């Protein structure tokens, strides 16, 4: 961990979470869902779009917003990404010097999502700032030891992911991500959350 990341984590730990009253909701009853994720490649982007389509078409969620962080400067962002109202993406050039997003994400933060889902297994500081600042009624994400209080519902990491640890290649990493994401969506769809 470099010094900028340490300072960013320190600032994040001192950032006061937005005052809100958490309210549970299952995906079957949700009207609006926000998805936070780290952009990887075009195939991953299509996977996320497929998740959003499933939420709309299969579960009847009326408003699905996706927000990704691209770990590049604006001039190097992939061509398939589009900035749009209430979603889209932000990149390194949209962060201040210690990693906090500025400007571009404000409308997403202010959206009153029924459920905000962090799709990242490992903490991404830029996304953590958005998560902490969000007005979402319920925040869901994977168990992260460094950030145990960030979510209203923590979905435990699968035993396979824990046993594999850091010795994974990109394909194994994606299969672990897919398994965790499926577990997350299965839980918040089937659980009687009220």
Predicted regions and their residues:
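Short, conserved loop/helix-junction motifs that constitute active-site signature segments
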Residues: 57-59, 109-110, 131-135
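Active-site-proximal region of nucleotide-activated glycan assembly enzymes
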Residues: 146-194
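Structural motif
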Residues: 114-117
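Histidine-anchored nucleotide/phosphate-binding helix
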Residues: 41-60
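Conserved nucleotide-cofactor-binding alpha/beta core module
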Residues: 56-107
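Active-site proximal beta-strand in glycosyltransferases
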Residues: 137-149
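Short N-terminal or domain-adjacent regulatory/targeting segments
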Residues: 1-32, 42
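An aromatic- and histidine-rich active-site surface loop
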Residues: 120-134
